[in-house]
Regions:
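Active-site hotspot residues in diverse enzymes, especially metal/ion-binding acidic/histidine motifs
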Residues: 1-195
Length: 195
């Protein structure tokens, strides 16, 4: 049975095109409901709009660092330390790590994202956004739901940034009608599709 048929068999219905789906370890289908996909897309555009992502000098890593989150390449760690971070990571993905832990002296919450820099720039951005999503979506443990949500968030963030780089969509809309119009137009389009 192909994956689409498995999903139909498991859920008892055809899945909408915008359902994000994955398989759990035992092969049971996992589906992220369309309303949750929509919530995550809105969170992505709101996150980017809050920091004026359409500026020519926008740097996504700087945006994340300004929130007190450290970003490191895998090569910055010794193999032993990298393995320690993997064990406490919220992510189940081998390409990136998202670790939250108390500072040993101050007790303050430390947040770190580490990624495999041996990928092209778009893949690295996708990995960093995936790990950032675990923090942004307040995930507290590894789960298939967390992985699917993080993937959805990372795809939305990457899509908005690529559209901006290629076509200057955000800058054009903001210059013509203002930042609130950009976010509200996307929100309205999602609500209309849900109805």
């Amino acid at each position: 049975m192909e994956e689409t048929e498995n999903m139909k068999h498991f859920t008892g219905r055809e899945l909408p095109d915008n359902a994000l789906k994955a398989s759990m370890a035992d092969g049971t289908p996992y589906v992220l409901p369309p309303w949750r996909v929509n919530d995550i897309i809105l969170l992505a555009i709101e996150t980017l709009s809050d920091v004026d992502y359409y500026r020519d000098d926008f740097d996504y890593k700087k945006m994340i660092r300004e929130q007190g989150i450290k970003i490191k390449k895998f090569s910055a760690f010794s193999p032993d330390n990298l393995e320690k971070f993997r064990k406490i990571s919220l992510s189940r993905w081998e390409e990136g790590i998202c670790a939250l832990f108390p500072h040993p002296v101050t007790g303050e919450q430390c947040r770190i994202i580490a990624y495999n820099e041996n990928r092209n720039s778009i893949e690295c951005m996708q990995i960093v956004f995936h790990e950032y999503a675990h923090i942004k979506l307040h995930h507290t443990q590894q789960s298939i739901n967390g992985e699917v949500e993080a993937t959805c968030f990372a795809l939305a963030m990457t899509m908005f940034l690529l559209l901006e780089q290629l076509f200057h969509v955000g800058k054009t809309v903001v210059n013509a009608a203002g930042k609130p119009f950009l976010v509200q137009t996307i929100r309205n389009a999602i609500k209309q599709k849900e109805a």
